[in-house]
Amino acid sequence: MTAEPSSAPPEQPILRRIALSLQYEGSDFCGWQRQNNARSVQAVLETAIAQLDPLRPIQSFAAGRTDAGVHAAAQVVHFDCSGPIPAAKWAPALNGRLPASIRVRESVERPRDWHACYSAVYRRYRYIIHNGRRPNLFLTPWTWHRYHHRLNEENMRVALEGMIGLHDFAAFMRAGSRRPHSRTTIQDVLVEREGDLIRVEIQASGFLYGMVRLLMAQLVAVGEHRLSVKAFEQRWRDRRRDQVREAAPARGLCLLRAGYAEPIFSEAGWYDCQPWFSLATDDPPPDPPCFAKDEQQELQ
């Protein structure tokens, strides 16, 4: 007697969610997000993942959608996989298939309801200005060389500290944004000089399209005394996008890290991911307190 063929649907593979801590040198890419006829970090990464898990379409999600030319020291990415590769083995396996300009520092497994973008409570960006008289070839790929005269970093710090809190930053949002509003919460800022290098860091629940580079150009105007601290504040409080035209170069900007309600990767990795021009005594900034749910939705 021949058994009746089963009409039950085939079993679906059990999917696991893998989180990656990712570094990339952004000069050769059109940004994180996949684009037609351009080389993106997302497309290159997904091609490498598909070589290791070829049985299903691969889609990855990132904590921050960096623009063309912007670097990342510890971008956080997740994807779902169906294969048997242990979570910790994804990092070396991918590094063997990725170009030298993209490195996976660590790979861990996360619950299926965890999301690299929507679970993040903050992102922290760093911008480096080279304020020396002469250009330096070895600093050029990572900094904005700007010297009309010595920048006043104290004025820059005061201007930036006035932005802390939940505000409407429409003045610093480029055209083409898909966000329904221009509000976000700036949680922490830092302006520090070491020799000819000025380091600016901004931590926020989320960033508007083009926000940091537009803001940095205005902040440098404050440092050069072309714009007063009061005029800077009035400009963004009045949401005067027509007065904010110049954007700082992408090469000076780096996505430093994204933060979550609980640690995702090893703390030792924080020190490994620091760009070489950072201060050697850096410590990881403390995690911010739990913010209200509506503030956590101010995501890029």
Swiss-Prot record:
EC number: 5.4.99.12
Active site, renumbered: 67
GO biological process terms held by the UniProt record: tRNA pseudouridine synthesis
First and last residue of the signal peptide: none
Annotated disulfide bonds: none
Catalyzed reaction equations: uridine(38/39/40) in tRNA = pseudouridine(38/39/40) in tRNA
Binding site for substrate: 125
Organism domain of life: Bacteria
MF GO annotations: RNA binding; tRNA pseudouridine(38-40) synthase activity
Top-level EC class: isomerase
Assigned keywords, A-Z: Isomerase, tRNA processing
Oligomer and partners: Homodimer.
Function: Formation of pseudouridine at positions 38, 39 and 40 in the anticodon stem and loop of transfer RNAs.
Family: Belongs to the tRNA pseudouridine synthase TruA family.
Protein name: tRNA pseudouridine synthase A
